[in-house]
Amino acid sequence: MRKIFIYAMWGFVFICIAAVAIVFTAIAKGKIGYVPPVEELENPNLKFATQVISEDGKLLGTWSLSKENRVYVGYEDLSPHLVHALVATEDVRFEDHSGIDARAFMRAVIKRGIFMQKHAGGGSTITQQLAKQFYSPTADNVMERLLQKPIEWVIAVKLERYYTKEEILTMYLNKFDFLNNAVGIKTAAKTYFAKDPKNLKIEEAATLIGMCKNPSLYNPRRFNERSRGRRNTVLDQMRKAGFLTQEECDSLQALPLVLKFQPVDHKDGLATYFREYLRGVMTARKPDRSDYRGWQMQKYYEDSLAWETNPLYGWCAKNKKKDGTNYNIYTCLLYTSP
């Protein structure tokens, strides 16, 4: 009887492993769910706002089609405190895995599935969370979410193949929605602390990273004490990971959570009339005589001359990307001089 039980148990394990292998193979081959092609993984759509920068390097403002106003920031312009806080809190073995952390996953399965511990922590890596942000719409029910999980695993493994760890961290922080129209870490740092990401203090970085668990629940503007508690949890995780000493952690946890909240709007900034004029010039199309009334012929000749002689006039229509499509003024980086 005991042998039969052992055989049955191992048979069940084998069937489960085979089923998982079949599911993952079907997902990887595109038979189940949507797995983006290589081209899409290599060029994810982050919808960054265009930055208008003066000749002396000052930011005049941005152009954006939405209220998100997401502005790109490179890895070199991120505070190391942000990176340390994110890795320590969300994925402590980030540097060691290839998209899936088997140890974290099994821990989550055992604690949540067997011991029913609601606060046992998740098993998703930073790369899996990035895959979810890019390609998983909000699930309507538990079964739909369960199907999304293995698809995210496959996408996460592919992302790890095409991007470095630094690039994955950068995309994650540029993609995340920190609420209050603060999408992306650069806008979030400006909105909550009135500074660039590279200048964030340890406790400020911990506050923003604390929002990654649940931005609505840990919104520092609405729930200061709750957000402070979450910040302190992040600081403690940084201590456990070796990024902070016990003394540093204790002193930072004692600090109040102080914001310099100032919503960022793409319509704000310097030289607003000039920026609007420049936008009109760069998005102009090649003049067509049929679009001009009889009394507008002088305007037609002026626009035609500008099209032929001014490289900025109609810049978006004149220039194309590597894929053959025209540039979009709302998704490119522009340097100009007022």
What are these regions (language model features)?
Residues 46-49, 53-245, 251, 267, ...:
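Peptidoglycan glycan-strand catalytic modules in the bacterial/periplasmic cell-wall system
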Residues 263-264:
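Flexible loop and strand-edge segments within Gram-negative outer membrane beta-barrel domains
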Residues 249-260:
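Terminal amphipathic helices with adjacent charged low-complexity linkers/tails
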Residues 335-338:
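Conserved small/polar residues in nucleotide/adenosyl-binding loops
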